[in-house]
Amino acid sequence: MKRTYQPHKTPKKRTHGFRLRMKTKNGRKVINARRAKGRKRLAA
């Protein structure tokens, strides 16, 4: 049986990337929340 997670960098970046997060107000909210929490990685 084929596994469900077949990772690919490009689609991942396009849907959860930093630049995509910065596009919208809510996306920036996500980044700021993760900064406040002290996350090592802010976006995918």
From Swiss-Prot:
Know the name of this protein? Large ribosomal subunit protein bL34
User: Which InterPro entries does the record match to this protein?
Assistant: Ribosomal_bL34, Ribosomal_bL34_CS
Which NCBIfam families does the record match to this protein?
A: rpmH_bact
Q: Which UniProt keywords apply?
A: Ribonucleoprotein, Ribosomal protein
PROSITE patterns for this protein: RIBOSOMAL_L34
Q: Write down any Gene Ontology CC term.
A: ribonucleoprotein complex
Report the HAMAP family cross-referenced here. Answer: Ribosomal_bL34 (MF_00391)
- GO MF annotation, one: structural constituent of ribosome
Q: What family is this?
A: Belongs to the bacterial ribosomal protein bL34 family.
User: Would the keyword Ribonucleoprotein be found if you checked this record's keyword annotation?
Assistant: yes
Protein species of origin: Campylobacter concisus (strain 13826)
Q: Where are the transmembrane segments?
A: none
Q: Name one GO biological process term.
A: translation
Q: Quick check: keyword Protein biosynthesis in the entry?
A: no
